[in-house]
């Protein structure tokens, strides 16, 4: 795995996590 792939994985993980936090927050969990 090169640095570019690692960068994309970290960005997508952070993005998905932030989306999940927003969705869960709106549902009052």
Curated annotation (Swiss-Prot):
Q: Which UniProt keywords apply?
A: Electron transport, Membrane, Photosynthesis, Thylakoid, Transmembrane, Transmembrane helix, Transport
Topology versus the membrane: Single-pass membrane protein
**Is Transport given among the entry's keywords?**
yes
Record's subunit section: The 4 large subunits of the cytochrome b6-f complex are cytochrome b6, subunit IV (17 kDa polypeptide, PetD), cytochrome f and the Rieske protein, while the 4 small subunits are PetG, PetL, PetM and PetN. The complex functions as a dimer.
Query: Mind telling me which residue stretches traverse the membrane in this protein?
Result: 3-23
Q: Where in the cell is it found?
A: Cellular thylakoid membrane
Coding gene? petN
Q: Which SUPFAM superfamilies match?
A: PetN subunit of the cytochrome b6f complex (SSF103451)
Give one GO molecular function term: electron transporter, transferring electrons within cytochrome b6/f complex of photosystem II activity
Which family, according to UniProt?
Answer: Belongs to the PetN family.
Q: What is this protein called?
A: Cytochrome b6-f complex subunit 8
- Cellular component aspect of the GO annotation: cytochrome b6f complex; plasma membrane-derived thylakoid membrane
Role of this protein: Component of the cytochrome b6-f complex, which mediates electron transfer between photosystem II (PSII) and photosystem I (PSI), cyclic electron flow around PSI, and state transitions.
User: Keyword Transmembrane, does the record have it?
Assistant: yes
């Amino acid at each position: 795995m090169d640095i570019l792939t690692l960068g994309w994985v970290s960005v997508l993980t952070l993005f998905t996590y932030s989306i999940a936090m927003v969705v869960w927050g709106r549902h009052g969990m």
